[in-house]
Design a protein with these regions (language model features):
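Glycine-rich beta-strand-centered segment in the early N-terminal region that forms part
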Residues: 20-34, 47-93
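Short N-terminal binding/cap micro-motifs at the start of the first secondary-structure element
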Residues: 11-14, 38-39
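Cytochrome P450 core scaffold surrounding the K-helix E-X-X-R motif
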Residues: 39-45
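Residue-level recognition of beta-strand termini and adjacent short loop/turns
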Residues: 8-10, 23
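Short Gly/Pro-enriched turn/cap motifs at secondary-structure boundaries
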Residues: 7, 18-19, 52-58, 109-113
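NAD(P)H dinucleotide-binding glycine-rich loop of Rossmann-like/cofactor-binding domains
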Residues: 89-121
Length: 121
């Protein structure tokens, strides 16, 4: 699949990457649309201290579920989805009081993990 990859600050390439396989409890999304925002620009320019490189940016994206991992109902296949890029643990204190945005294990797609500027995520 083709992906937009920030190799390091100010160095962007379109790269061929392997098709991701969904893990247990996960789905794979065939990306239809992805938006770009200031956060992506900051990662490109090297102004986001949390970004790790190389990185597929894009945390605002929409698509269709085309594969499911173990434990996910096959009825999800074909569903259109808008992706919430913030992944929280659900168990730490901030998560337990309804503040998953400050989870102690917070992961953001397009920042800590590859995001939506690919054909699949």
């Amino acid at each position: 699949m083709k992906s937009v990859v920030i190799q390091q600050p100010n160095a962007l390439v379109i790269e061929e990457r392997p098709l991701p396989l969904p893990g247990a409890g996960d789905v794979r999304v065939r990306i239809k649309l992805a938006g770009i925002c200031g956060s992506d620009s900051h990662i490109y320019r090297g102004h986001n201290p949390f970004a790790k490189y190389p990185r597929v940016i894009g945390h605002e994206f929409f698509g269709e579920i085309d594969a499911v991992g173990e434990g996910v109902e096959s009825t999800r296949l074909g569903q259109r989805v808008s992706v919430d890029p913030v992944i929280s643990c659900g168990h730490c204190y901030p998560c337990s009081v309804g503040k998953p945005n400050v989870c102690t294990s917070l992961v953001v797609l397009g920042v800590h993990r590859d995001g939506g500027f690919s054909e699949y995520a």
